[in-house]
Amino acid sequence: PERYDVIVFKNPNDGKQNYIKRLIGLPGDNLLIENGDIYVMDEVDGEYEKSITRKPPEKLKNVLQAVDDTNHIGELLNDVQWPSRWQAFDGSKQWTTDATGENPVFRSSAQPDAHWLRYRHYQPFKNEWSTISSGLLPTRFRNNSLPPGRLIGDQYGYNDGVYQNNEALVSTQNLGLHWVGDLGLEFWVDIKSSDGTLMFDVVEGGVHFVCEIDIATGKATLSAQDEASKTKVTFQDASGNPVESPSAKTKINGSGSHHIMYVNADDRLNLWIDNNYVEFDAAAFTWDGIPIPTYSADDPGDAEPAGIAAKNAELDITRIKVLRDLYYTSVKGQGPLGSQISTENETGESISIIEAYHRDPESWSSDGAADFFTAKKGQTEPMFRLEKGETPDKDQFLPMGDNSPRSLDGRVWDGEKFVERDMLIGRAMLIYWPHTLNKPIKYFPNFSRMGFIK
């Protein structure tokens, strides 16, 4: 099997039980989980050198988690006129919003300068839901006040609503305990002009990862604008050589409608146009330090972590989704549900401190925030060592679940943290009976979730 395949295997602690997880570690690997990513550490002259592992594009595409979708805004939020998360926060008139239809349409007029439509992660606080449920907008948004956005965390929608005796054991916000810097942008655009420039970006650690597409020629160019960041980024080609301005040819050729997905994951930029993967001459990159969130009034950075702009081009954006990569946690939680759920983050800080940093961009420049966001980063020793067996059937593999905060996988098993090859059953191929919908009748099949596993 290959890394990031979904595999079925016998539970090492109960040979009668089959497990299904994603394969993360291979025989001979020294593994490190850091910043939500998976690293392999090779020993050189008595010291370990780490290299990030990268999900193949099609596997990456299928594990991305939805953060926001302009076509799916909660009814309660609409009722209180919750502020749009997508706005021209700089006050530019280049962008207008048509809200007359079922879903908003964002329109850009043709202007010589690029003004950005940007995203702020306006997530209701736990104590605001009672106000919203009573039909009122929380006070922080009244009088046309628009505070900075909060950080995007590793929240999983299918972990929401963990209850016992009608009491919430873990609130929604408590299931997003780690800042996720690996973000993506998916949007549907109708380009009205035959030339001009379409631009979009995602931000991590204050670095704007910008993609510019020449509408007339289809040439796409990447850049890492890291002036406001505490770390610097270098693009590298497949041979490890630095590349200043990576580029690629796309199928965009003048006016037309397109579906675009742009994702920063595993220290690589990924672009799909109309479901076709775009190959750049260099899309992988390295950091010269540890990325931490940045914010200033001039450049909100990670408080506005995604954006779309146009220059000398008229276009309509009919739908926008904000996405995030999986975040693999390296802690064994001791929450109210036992080891299956983590109510701490990797710093060991309390939920109140974590929440305070996540929601307050002004605090990100403090020494305390720097210590918080770099805690358990820059480690020099692997966490898991997997052996090649004396015979192939004893080779060791490490499986992990995509729902990392609640996955009972190799990270948290008692005893050995691996599966031997002779316990592997095979690759998972098909979801043939997902959890039923129970409507319009009980046990009604969920046909939309049936399909091949990637």
Residue ranges with predicted function:
Residues 1-454:
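Extended hydrophobic leader/signal-anchor segments used for secretion and membrane insertion
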